[in-house]
Amino acid sequence: MYYSVLRLPNGTELKGGEAGSTLKALTLHAAVNAGQEFTIASAFSDYIEAEIWADPDGSLQITAGDALTYYRQDDAGNRTKVGVFYAEKPTRTKRNSYKVTAYDTMSKLDADFSGWLHANQAPFPKPIWQLVQLACQRAGVALASSSLPINGNYSVQAFYADDLTCRQIISWAAEAAGCYAHMNADGKLQFLTYTDKRSTAKITPDGASNSTAYYADSLSYEDYAVKAIEKVQIRQSDSDVGVSHS
């Protein structure tokens, strides 16, 4: 069984999974795009929602902007780091209970980029990867990837747009590279490509040599109720009377 652990900036840990726990509930919402289809250029934030108990005589130790490190811990005490999340302003739901919503480091990339762009037109054109590095520097986000999967040297000409965010720069770079952007467990930005991890299985008898295979779980079927076929008419063209068979 796994338990949730939230580590606060001061090192305090809130633990769940047992009677009297400070961390009453925690839900992780994770996605790389908005739907079921592959979407390049996505730059989604994962986020957590936590219900935290606080002593009525004390105060909640979390404030807006705090970095919360989320771990999953098993019965043996082994921990897996899930991610780093930045808290929104906590909401008091009961006398001694608070709801905390926190978004991963991708949310920091919502910082403005237009101001820098307006003041730095002269150095263009720039490689798109350099633009990614500048956007991350502006937002205070570390990079896990050392380059884009492809097209990292694509030359970007001078441009300007109002209300442009660092996240939009990241999204454009991901689109140019045919990939998506996501944060790793250490809160660092990475550019990833979609990989098909489904297994394949041949549908021929054992021992038969056939290169045609299908992806497991990729086939589906449906049952339909149809009227009985009473007559078949064969025609060579729309104007042909044809031959009928009953």
Residue ranges and their predicted role:
Residues 29-65:
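Extracellular/virion structural assembly segments
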Residues 1, 5-43:
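Solvent-exposed edge beta-strands and adjacent loop segments
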Residues 45-47, 65, 82, 216, ...:
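Surface-exposed or flexible loop/turn and strand-edge residues in extracellular/cell-surface modules
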Residues 87, 102-104, 154-159, 200-207, ...:
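Extracellular, surface-exposed passenger/stalk and repeat segments of large secreted bacterial proteins
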Residues 2, 54-142:
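Surface-exposed cap/loop segments at beta↔alpha junctions
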Residues 45-49, 94-99, 186-188:
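A generic structural signal for beta-strand entry/edge sites
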Residues 1-19, 171, 175, 180-246:
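Acidic, small/polar-enriched beta strand-loop surface segments
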Residues 35-37, 108-133, 146-172:
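Short acidic/polar beta-strand-loop edge motifs in secreted extracellular
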